[in-house]
């Protein structure tokens, strides 16, 4: 019989690990993240190993709410991106739902420009195209001379509402 005992990575091997203490994280990423005050974000989960749909939706909403002040602090302290304008348009979705488009473009944009269609992060369950980290990224990209269309889509949970797949 073998005495082999696997060493599991991450929380499987050490349930006390956090994002900051996990030895697998690239030190450069850890250094960059150090400015985000991750101590402000709750790291423990109250979810069981088999949560109900309602518990999952509530958990996602709580996660989103706990991260918002971190992003607001980080990106709210940056100077505005100059030479960029923003406007909002609403289009009709296939279900008759309204879809907000936030259009970021160079202030001097009366000419054909390259563009990108950008969807925000959050795994299609939380966050918003108007969150400061996504607005900043779109402004930075627009400042390089392109049009950026940030799409606000229905999430599976969080502040934009509970819209189960396929929303």
Predicted regions and their residues:
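A fold-wide structural signal in alpha/beta-hydrolase
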Residues: 142-149
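Catalytic nucleophile-loop/oxyanion-hole region of alpha/beta-hydrolase
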Residues: 128-129, 133, 137, 149-167
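Short, low-complexity Ser/Thr-rich regulatory SLiMs
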Residues: 103-108, 155
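A glycine/proline-hinged amphipathic helix-loop "lid/cap" segment
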Residues: 1-98, 103
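Short strand-connecting beta-turns/loops that link adjacent beta-strands
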Residues: 96, 108-110
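Short beta-strand element of the alpha/beta-hydrolase
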Residues: 101, 111-123
């Amino acid at each position: 019989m073998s005495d082999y005992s696997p060493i599991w990575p991450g929380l499987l091997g050490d349930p006390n690990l956090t994002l900051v203490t996990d030895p697998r994280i690239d030190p450069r990423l850890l250094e960059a993240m150090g400015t985000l005050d991750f101590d402000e974000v709750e790291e423990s989960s109250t979810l069981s190993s088999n949560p109900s749909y309602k518990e999952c939706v509530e958990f996602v909403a709580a996660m989103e709410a706990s991260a918002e002040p971190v992003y607001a602090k980080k990106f709210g302290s940056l100077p505005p991106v100059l030479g960029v304008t923003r406007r909002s348009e609403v289009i009709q979705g296939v279900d008759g739902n309204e879809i907000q488009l936030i259009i970021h473009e160079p202030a001097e944009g009366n000419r054909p420009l390259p563009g990108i269609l950008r969807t925000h992060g959050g795994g299609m369950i939380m966050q918003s195209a108007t969150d400061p980290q996504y607005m900043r990224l779109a402004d930075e990209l627009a400042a390089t001379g392109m049009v950026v269309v940030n799409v606000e889509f229905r999430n599976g949970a969080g502040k934009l509402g509970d819209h189960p797949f396929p929303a």
